[in-house]
């Protein structure tokens, strides 16, 4: 059965446009509360959010909906998505809720759920929640209405967890780093993690005002970080996104190090330590150079559909401990249950300490193929199936690339976009072919 509201990463859209409205969030809290009360033991849910101004409005609406269903809520305040996943598990909550649109601008927002194991909900439960959304809303008997409390030490708990993911006794003394928190939910967490591990920390994007999340800062726009690393002669820079589940880094030369390269650095380190066997999971968008580098380690490289939930599903299916996306979602399954930007950065820094090499040196084991990604924005979500013009141009591009490249056309799971990706050995050819194909997509849907 096809889901009406849930996409690849929960429910997301523009604030004020249905379903990202207070009345829908009230009903969603009630529907989810009914499902959780029926399907899972206990009646307690955690709610965290990023720093968008609309988060406060939706937090109140969800809280009221859960209360009407007889479910208690514990409010975490601004908290990274991976922190909510971790706290849901360790505090033995029935479920965790994150109010966030991740890397999107402030005027978008969304909701995603975690189960008691800290994993994203399976499709069956999302479908059941949608079923309840279609039912009349009722309120439990008054004495059973849920209560709301606030957890005041949530950030401290998560900071200690992050530090525990590297060897006890390891520290970053003498390392100068710049941390960009994207004016998002890591602003009060990430700087403390790295400074408590004795790094010298400069910060960017740590003054959220409700409107500036992801605005020319963070993992989706590392240019300011790149310049700051160079100006301050820092060893590296760390860029997180608005909800803290993505990581992009900058080396001491000011070169951006993306999720594919970081995944290789961690895989290479784990393999050298004898901790990594079997396969590493990427996505259809992962750079061909990553696949080749992983295979040179004697490991299998598997490609999942785009989206960290699909990466995790494939990791679980094949027993993989490491996976990720070029966008910066990296999952270290022996440490986390979802993408975690801070934890991933700590694994990279730990390898810098162990190896005595710079980030620039560590990434050299992978040769990135030139890759161009063009986002073609449309008025609404569409299907690419049976569009003759697009299929014709796609076939022409594939023929020109031959065996030395890849082409991928993919609708975004969260926005009305078609993502056009072309990858090959020659950068000029890749750019020309990607622009040609993106132009064909735009023309096909402009009428």
UniProtKB/Swiss-Prot annotation:
GO terms for biological process: carbohydrate metabolic process; peptidoglycan biosynthetic process; UDP-N-acetylglucosamine biosynthetic process. Its cofactor is Mg(2+). The active site is at residue 102. Binds 1 Mg(2+) ion per subunit. It is an enzyme of class 5 (isomerase). Mg(2+) binds at residues 102, 241, 243, 245. Activated by phosphorylation. Keywords: Isomerase, Magnesium, Metal-binding, Phosphoprotein. GO terms for cellular component: cytosol. Its EC number is 5.4.2.10. GO terms for molecular function: magnesium ion binding; phosphoglucosamine mutase activity; phosphomannomutase activity. It comes from the Bacteria. It catalyses: alpha-D-glucosamine 1-phosphate = D-glucosamine 6-phosphate. The modification Phosphoserine is found at residue 102. Belongs to the phosphohexose mutase family. HAMAP family: GlmM_B. Catalyzes the conversion of glucosamine-6-phosphate to glucosamine-1-phosphate. This is Phosphoglucosamine mutase. It comes from Methylococcus capsulatus (strain ATCC 33009 / NCIMB 11132 / Bath).
């Amino acid at each position: 059965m096809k889901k009406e509201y849930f996409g690849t990463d929960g429910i997301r859209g523009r604030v004020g446009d249905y379903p990202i409205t207070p009345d829908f969030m009230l009903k969603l809290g009630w529907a989810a509360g009914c499902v959780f009360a029926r399907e899972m033991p206990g009646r307690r849910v955690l709610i965290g959010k990023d720093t968008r101004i609309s988060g406060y409005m939706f937090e109140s609406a969800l809280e009221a909906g859960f209360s009407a269903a007889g479910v208690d809520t514990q409010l975490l305040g601004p908290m990274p998505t991976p922190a909510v996943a971790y706290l849901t598990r360790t505090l033995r909550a029935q479920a965790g809720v994150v109010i966030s649109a991740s890397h999107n601008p402030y005027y978008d927002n969304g909701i995603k759920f975690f189960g008691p194991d800290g994993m994203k909900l399976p499709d069956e439960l999302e479908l059941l929640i949608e079923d309840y959304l279609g039912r009349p809303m009722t309120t439990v008997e008054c004495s059973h209405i849920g209560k709301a409390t606030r957890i005041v030490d949530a950030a401290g708990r998560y900071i200690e967890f992050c530090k525990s993911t590297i060897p006890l006794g390891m520290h970053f003394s003498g390392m100068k780093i710049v941390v960009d928190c994207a004016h998002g939910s890591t602003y009060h967490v990430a700087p403390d993690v790295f400074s408590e591990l004795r790094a010298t920390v400069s910060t960017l994007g740590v003054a959220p005002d409700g409107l500036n999340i992801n605005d020319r800062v963070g993992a989706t726009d590392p240019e300011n970080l790149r310049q700051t690393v160079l100006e301050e002669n820092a060893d590296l820079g760390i860029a997180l996104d608005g909800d803290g589940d993505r990581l992009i880094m900058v080396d001491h030369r000011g070169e951006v190090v993306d999720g594919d390269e970081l995944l290789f650095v961690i895989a290479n380190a784990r393999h050298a330590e004898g901790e990594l066997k079997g396969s590493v999971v990427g996505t259809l968008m992962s750079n061909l150079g990553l696949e080749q580098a992983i295979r040179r380690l004697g490991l299998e490289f598997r490609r999942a559909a785009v989206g960290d939930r699909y990466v995790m599903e494939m990791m679980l299916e094949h027993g993989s401990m490491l996976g990720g996306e070029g966008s910066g979602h990296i999952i270290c399954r022996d440490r986390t249950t979802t993408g975690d930007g801070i934890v991933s950065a700590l694994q990279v820094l730990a390898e810098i300490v162990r190896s005595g090499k710079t980030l620039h040196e560590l990434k050299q084991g992978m040769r990135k193929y030139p890759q161009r990604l063009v986002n073609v924005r449309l008025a609404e979500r569409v299907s690419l199936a049976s569009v003759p013009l697009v299929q014709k141009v796609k076939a022409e591009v594939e023929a020109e690339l031959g065996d030395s490249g890849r082409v991928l056309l993919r609708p975004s799971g969260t926005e009305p976009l078609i993502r056009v990706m072309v990858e090959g050995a020659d950068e000029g050819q890749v750019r020309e072919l990607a622009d040609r194909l993106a132009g064909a997509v735009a023309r096909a849907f402009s009428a």
